[in-house]
Amino acid sequence: MITEFKESPLYKIAKDNNCLLLEHHKDVGGRYSIFTNVGIVPAIISGLNIDALFSGASEVINNIGNYKPYDLGRYLIQKENVKFTNNVLMTYSDSLYFFGKWYLQLWAESIGKNNKGITAIHSVGTTDQHSQLQLYLDGPKDKYFTFITTDHSNKGIKINNDMFEGTAIDYFKDKTMGDLMEAEQRATIETFKLNNFSFREIYIPKIDEQNLGKLLSFSIIET
């Protein structure tokens, strides 16, 4: 059990039941604890490569000038003519689903201060783009968008060619489900470009521990 070493209901339960206790450092806030035993122990149990995770995080910290985590804050401040009230994070990989949930906490606890702040929204591509894109495109222009994309080309199961033979959509022949995902994310980003939306794309060539460590570290420094 991981908890602070102080008299608390959780600490008492652990002691009374002779549980293995690991101390959680009281000076590390919840949103930053992902790199402490709170986040690392579950990661080890899940079989993740922790060395690669920390290596990726260190890469960003030691090369901040290359990754430029301060650019978003600078941009939002300089756009005085636009009142951004929402920060939309759209991830195009199921592997980043829980990263998105953590990002909401990170952003809210870091940015929401003194009756000020920008609300973070996590959208999952392509699922949420079908339910939310209408609002994003034709609604109020008060949102900044971050697309986190990866390479889906030629991945996943191949579409049944016979199904589309002789139809108006026979261009699906010889394509994979990954090809469809790739087309979806590229088309959405191109639409945002054509409409002059404020957005950025963070491209991750492979969703692995090394790149996840980079993404986590980058996000913490950014906020």
Can you annotate each of these PLM segments?
Residues 2-146, 151-154:
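Active-site phosphate/pyrophosphate-binding segments
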Residues 18-23, 88, 196-207:
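Short amphipathic alpha-helical segments and their helix-coil junctions
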Residues 35, 42, 213, 222-223:
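Alpha-helix boundary/interfacial micro-motifs
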Residues 95-203, 210-217, 223:
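C-terminal catalytic subdomain
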